[in-house]
Every structure is written in structure tokens, then in C-alpha cells.
């Protein structure tokens, strides 16, 4: 009898011990996970503050360059240095400032250069966008349809233009949605426009942007040879892409001081004076700041849009996480 009691007691002790070990293991696991979550959260918060500091520094660099050379913005200034890296406690910041006047602003597509687009059947910016598509390999018919669809996406009405697409087209899709009928707040919206697939989006992405203004302006002093398809389209393809590359190659090291100086070079197409004066610029006021911060094992991405007005820099937009992604 006593032997059985001892066996039962031993079994109870073993069960209690097993239960205690299980509870201890669960507590240890949960504590470890909580610690990792806390550590990850703290690293992300630290990385965010580093990014905001780098953003402020970027604005100061732009201000300094503007003070040193108030009349122009050109490749070779401090802001344009590629692959900037800054070591910080526990990690590293990498960043790049880019001129937002080296891309086609899709929000200008419905506007004439002087906001008189309502008087024009096909506004000049829409012609530029259509020719940019052609320069990137699109057929004329598809380029016209996509241009019309982008115009309908942004315009305020629900009346489709010729070859365009409004709510009725999007409502018939397998996953229906509606047009924005307002400015694009981010260039990734372009992927939602009818007719723009992932392949075209990838090809367009380096040449387009979405700025919070309706004006179209291209800084001739910061374009690269890669931007030849856009520069050619700006002159309605009266300038070939080879000529556009040659124009960039012959640009002075500190850029052109004014459009008048550029026009005197003879590098522009004949009868292009009006286009140059209305669209081209030698100075920029919009800049993208792309930042990546690594703290420990955490990566933090931030993309900011800065507006430089005189000596004042304003942060107009911030995006955290991934940016300029391509959906399937």
C-alpha cells in the first residue's frame, strides 16, 4: 500500500515538475519575443530620428548651394553628390538628393504652360507625354490611348475624352475601382491607370514624377544623357535623342547661366525659342531626398519631397517604407 502511495506521489511530483518546466519554457519564449519586438521597435524609432536628421541636413545643403549660386541649379553642386554615407552610432545612413525637375510632372498633363489648357484640344504637356511614350518604344495608337487615360484619371470630370477611360471602364474590371479625378499624390498611382502594365510602368518610372503643382518645368542643367527620351519629347521630337545626348555632353561644367546663353549655342532646334523659354529652366526648387538607415539589423527607408523657396526649405511630403514599387 505504502509502495503504491509513494509511486502516486512520485508521479504527481513528476507531473508538477513537467508543468513547471512547460510554464517556464513558455514564459522564456514569450519574454524573448517581447524583447525582440521591443528591440526592433527601438531600432526603428532610432532609425526614423536619424532619417529626419538626415532630411534636415539635406535641406541645409540645398540652402548652402542656393546661397553660393542663387541663379542656377546644376549637377556638380554639393547636393548632387552620389551615394552619400554617414556612420552613426550602431549603424549607417545612406542618402541621395535628386532634382525633381528632371522628370515629367504627370500632374501638369492637363495644363497649358500658362494654365490655358482649356483653350487647347491637346495641351502641350500631353503632347510631351505621348511622345515620351513613343520614345520609350510604344506604338502611336497605344501612346495616344494611355495619354488620354492619364488625362482622364487626373481631370475633375467624369466625361471620357477620345480614347480615354473614366469610371465606367474601371467599374467593368475584375476588381473594380474609380478614377481619382484629382492630382496624383504619388507616382505609383500611375500603375492604376487603364492600359499601364508593369512593363510600361518600369520603363516610365525613371522619367516621370508627381509634384503638387500643375506646372511643367525641366532643368536643363541637371539632365543626364539617360534623360534624352524626355528632352527629345520636350521639343516634340524636333530634337533627336542623339542631339539631346549631345546637348547634355556639351553643357558647361557649372551649367548654363541662363536660357539666353543656351539659345546662343545653336544646340537647340530651329524655331524652338518659345518652347525653351516656357518649359526649360536653369534652376530648380523641387528635390527628392531618398534615405536608407540601418540600425543593428533594422532597415528604415524614407523618401521626402523638399521645396526650396529662396533660402527657405519646406518638407512637402514624406514616405516611409518601400517606394516606387512595381506591382505585378
Curated annotation (Swiss-Prot):
Family matches, as Pfam families = T2SSK, T2SSK_1st
Kindly report the protein's main subcellular placement as a broad class: membrane
Keywords from the named record: Cell inner membrane, Cell membrane, Membrane, Protein transport, Transmembrane, Transmembrane helix, Transport
User: Which compartment or compartments is the protein found in?
Assistant: Cell inner membrane
Gene Ontology annotations for the cellular component aspect, listed alphabetically = plasma membrane
Q: According to its UniProt record, how is this protein modified after translation?
A: Cleaved by prepilin peptidase.
Q: Which residues form the propeptide?
A: 1-7
Q: Which residues cross the membrane?
A: 8-28
Gene Ontology biological process: protein secretion
**Positions in the Periplasmic compartment:** 29-328
Q: How does it assemble?
A: Type II secretion is composed of four main components: the outer membrane complex, the inner membrane complex, the cytoplasmic secretion ATPase and the periplasm-spanning pseudopilus. Interacts with core component OutG.
- Quote the PANTHER family the UniProt record gives: TYPE II SECRETION SYSTEM PROTEIN K, TYPE II SECRETION SYSTEM PROTEIN K-RELATED
Can you tell me which family this protein belongs to?
A: Belongs to the GSP K family.
What is this protein for, i.e. what is its function?
Component of the type II secretion system required for the energy-dependent secretion of extracellular factors such as proteases and toxins from the periplasm. Plays a role in pseudopilus assembly and seems to control its length. Interacts with the pseudopilus tip complex that is critical for the recognition and binding of secretion substrates.
Protein's UniProt name: Type II secretion system protein K
Q: Which organism is it from?
A: Pectobacterium carotovorum subsp. carotovorum (Erwinia carotovora subsp. carotovora)
Gene behind the chain: outK
Amino acid at each position: 500500500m505504502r509502495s503504491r502511495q509513494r509511486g502516486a506521489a512520485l508521479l504527481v511530483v513528476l507531473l508538477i515538475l513537467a508543468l513547471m518546466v512547460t510554464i517556464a519554457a513558455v514564459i522564456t519564449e514569450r519574454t524573448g519575443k517581447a524583447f525582440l519586438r521591443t528591440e526592433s521597435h527601438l531600432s526603428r524609432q532610432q532609425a526614423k530620428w536619424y532619417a529626419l536628421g538626415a532630411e534636415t541636413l539635406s535641406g541645409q545643403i540645398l540652402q548652402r548651394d542656393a546661397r553660393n549660386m542663387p541663379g542656377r541649379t546644376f549637377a556638380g553642386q554639393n547636393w548632387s553628390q552620389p551615394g552619400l554615407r554617414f556612420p552613426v552610432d550602431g549603424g549607417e545612413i545612406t542618402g541621395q538628393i535628386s532634382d525633381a525637375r528632371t522628370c515629367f510632372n504627370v500632374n501638369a498633363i492637363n495644363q497649358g504652360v500658362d494654365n490655358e489648357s482649356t483653350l487647347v484640344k491637346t495641351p502641350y504637356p500631353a503632347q510631351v507625354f505621348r511622345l515620351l511614350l513613343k520614345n520609350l518604344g510604344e506604338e502611336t495608337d497605344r501612346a495616344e490611348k494611355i495619354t488620354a487615360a492619364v488625362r482622364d484619371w487626373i481631370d475633375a470630370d467624369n466625361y471620357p475624352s477620345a480614347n480615354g477611360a473614366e469610371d465606367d471602364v474601371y467599374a467593368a474590371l475584375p476588381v473594380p475601382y474609380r478614377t481619382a479625378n484629382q492630382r496624383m499624390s504619388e507616382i505609383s498611382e500611375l500603375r492604376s491607370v487603364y492600359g499601364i502594365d508593369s512593363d510600361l510602368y518600369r520603363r516610365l518610372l525613371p522619367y516621370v514624377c508627381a509634384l503638387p503643382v500643375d506646372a511643367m518645368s525641366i532643368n536643363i542643367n541637371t539632365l543626364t544623357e539617360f534623360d534624352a527620351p524626355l528632352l527629345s519629347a520636350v521639343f516634340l521630337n524636333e530634337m533627336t535623342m542623339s542631339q539631346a545626348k549631345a546637348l547634355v555632353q556639351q553643357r558647361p561644367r557649372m551649367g548654363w547661366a541662363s536660357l539666353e546663353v543656351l539659345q546662343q549655342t545653336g544646340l537647340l532646334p530651329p524655331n524652338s525659342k518659345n518652347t525653351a523659354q516656357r518649359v526649360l529652366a536653369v534652376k530648380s526648387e523641387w528635390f527628392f531626398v531618398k534615405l536608407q538607415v540601418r540600425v543593428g539589423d533594422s532597415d528604415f527607408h524614407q523618401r521626402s519631397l523638399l521645396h526650396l523657396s529662396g533660402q527657405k526649405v519646406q518638407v512637402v511630403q514624406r514616405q516611409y517604407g518601400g517606394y516606387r514599387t512595381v506591382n505585378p
